[in-house]
Design a protein with these regions (language model features):
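S-adenosyl-L-methionine
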Residues: 3-53
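Acidic-enriched, low-complexity/disordered segments with a strong bias for Aspartate over Glutamate
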Residues: 6, 22, 26, 47, ...
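C-terminal substrate-binding/active-site "lid" region of AdoMet-derived donor-dependent transferases
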Residues: 11-19, 44, 56-136
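Glutamate identity and glutamate-enriched acidic tracts
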Residues: 14, 25, 33-37, 65, ...
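Short C-terminal domain-edge/linker segments immediately following a structured domain
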Residues: 32-39, 47-51, 74-79, 115-119, ...
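SAM/dcSAM-binding transferase cores
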Residues: 118-180
């Protein structure tokens, strides 16, 4: 069984179910789950990528969020022992994504494609052997919650809902106090 999700319509592929939608939207994930009817997948491959802005830090942050979202989706539709592959950009927060993946798969590796330009930060995360349940390091959190916690721990602002948090100036995503 092959299920494809894309924002844009593509030519039909014999034997495949193609869903036109945003893989980060609940309605699209619901369509996938309804099609699966409780069946689980062996492999999830994602080449999700942001619409590039030309600002590396912004593109990398959006790529991290997209890859983490797809990791959470994959964990929900993969059978134990399954494999997840995603493309992301190397940079701030990537270790949080790798750690979240390691809590859900027994083998996690990063690869930079040899066909990619030397200056490219494109990397693939290959996650093999999905565990029946997440390791204790996940502490019941989603991958997105783990990555958000990782970003907070390294001083990156991920949300501004905490009225107690004193943030004087925001530059990109890193919070700076007036003293810096």
């Amino acid at each position: 069984m092959v299920v494809g999700v894309d924002l844009l319509a593509t030519s039909p592929v014999e034997g495949a179910k193609l869903i036109i939608g945003d893989a980060t939207e609940d309605s699209t994930i619901t369509q996938v789950e309804e099609f699966l009817e409780g069946r689980m997948l062996n492999v999830v491959i994602s080449d999700i990528s942001p619409s590039l802005t030309g600002r590396y830090d912004t593109d990398q942050a959006i790529s991290l969020e997209l890859s983490t979202t797809v990791l959470d989706v994959a964990v929900g539709v993969l059978q134990p022992g399954g494999t997840f592959v995603t493309k992301t950009f190397q940079g701030t927060g990537i270790e949080g994504l790798v750690d979240a993946a390691k809590d859900r798969f027994s083998n996690v590796q990063r690869y930079a494609p040899t066909a990619s330009r030397n200056a490219s930060s494109e990397t693939y995360l290959i996650c093999r052997n999905k565990l029946p349940r997440a390791r204790k390091g996940a502490n019941g959190r989603t991958a997105m919650e783990q990555v958000s916690d990782h970003l907070k721990n390294i001083g990156i602002v991920t949300n501004r809902n905490d009225p107690e948090e004193e943030v004087d100036t925001l530059v990109g995503l890193r919070k700076l106090s007036r003293r810096e």
